[in-house]
Structure formats: structure tokens, C-alpha cells
Amino acid sequence: MPVKKRTPLKHKSVSFSDDITQTQHNHHHRKKQNGERPPVFIRKTWLTIPWHLIALVYIYVKVFNNYNTAELLACLVPLQILYTIFQFNKATIYGNKRLKFNYSLAAISILACIVLSIPVVVIIILFGAPLLELLWETWLLALHCSFLAYPAVYSVLNCDFKVGLWKRYFILIVVGCWISCVVIPLDWDRDWQAWPIPIVIGAYLGAFVGFAYGAYL
């Protein structure tokens, strides 16, 4: 009687490489679906120090006649744009690389600051500013606050609307305005106590602190 040959059993091997590859693929796919964006941060460098804001405060107080807030705004806007191009944007890192300056986006940011000044006017009035009597001065103050935040506004638009990092700059401008309010009701009868002169100066000082030290906060 012939002996039947046994067929050798095949040993099953378990490999996790396919599972790992599939898991990595699914994780990468979920990142795309969730719209995960690269990190953004500001380099700790002297480039972010806005020395021009201190110079503008000095000119506003010592050079301009009667604290001309409109002339100060005319000086602020171009200097803020230049500061963003040559200083702040060079210190902004998005996704481990420095972004090139987008000039069309810079123009859009100017319009965004003008539009932003409208809700800022409303907020200032809600905090006690004259409603109609000094509306022009209040709007000038709102424009100053908006354009002081111009580098942050541009960066929000340029970094896919990641606003978390940039909130500190807006907050410090507001804090500067709030602290400077204390001198208005004091009975000193000084010209610089008139609305909105001390608030403008406080906004500039708050912006200076924000942009100079924002990377360290």
C-alpha cells in the first residue's frame, strides 16, 4: 500500500508594514480634509522693532501744530507699508519658510484697514466717545488704530487667515488706548488732553510694544 505524502503546511506570516502604510495614508488624507495648514510664527529679531512709531509720536507732539491727527495719519500709512515690506514680513515664517511680499495683497490690506475702522468707531463710541460732536476726530482715531495694525492685517490675509498669532498685536493697541484714557478727565487744562490726542499717543505706544515684543509673548 503506497504511503501518501503529506503536503507541508504553509506558515502564515503577519506583516504590519501594509497596515502602517495604510494608517499613514489615512492620516495624511485626514490632514488634507481638515485643511491643516503649516505653522506660522515671528522670528525673534530686532527687525520687528517699529522705531518709526516713536519718531511719529515725537513729530506729533513736538513738530505738528495743534497736534494735527490727520497729518499724522498721512505719515503713518506709507511708513507702515514700508515697515511691513522691509521688516515685519521678513521676520514672518510660514510653514518653515519666509513668504515673499505680495503687493496686490498689500493694496487689499489697505482697503481692509479702512473697512476695519468702521466697527472700531462703533466700539470707541460704545466706550464713551462723543457720538456726533467729535465724530471726525473719532474716525481719525479709528483709522490710526486700524493702520497701526496694518502689518498684522496683511499677515492674516497672507497666512490663510490664521488669526491666533496676530491677536496679541490688536490687543496691545487696545490696551495702549485704554491706559491713555486716564489723562482725559484730569483737570490739568493741557492742549494734549483734548480728544483724541492722548488716545492716539497711547495707541502708538501700544503698537510699538506689540510689534517690538510680540514675538516673545
From Swiss-Prot:
InterPro entries, per the entry: GPI_biosynthesis_protein_Pig-F
Q: Which GO terms describe its molecular function?
A: mannose-ethanolamine phosphotransferase activity
Tell me the leader sequence span: none
Lineage: superkingdom? Eukaryota
**Keyword terms:** Endoplasmic reticulum, Glycoprotein, GPI-anchor biosynthesis, Membrane, Transmembrane, Transmembrane helix
- Can you cite a GO biological process for this protein? GPI anchor biosynthetic process
Q: Which residues cross the membrane?
A: 45-65, 68-88, 107-127, 134-154, 169-189, 197-217
Sugar attachment sites: N102
Give the UniProt subcellular location, in the record's own words: Endoplasmic reticulum membrane
To which pathway does this protein belong? Glycolipid biosynthesis; glycosylphosphatidylinositol-anchor biosynthesis
Homology family = Belongs to the PIGF family.
Tell me the function of this protein: Acts in the GPI biosynthetic pathway between GlcNAc-PI synthesis and GPI transfer to protein.
Record protein name field: Glycosylphosphatidylinositol anchor biosynthesis protein 11
Name the species this protein comes from.
Answer: Candida glabrata (strain ATCC 2001 / BCRC 20586 / JCM 3761 / NBRC 0622 / NRRL Y-65 / CBS 138)
Name the gene that codes for it: GPI11
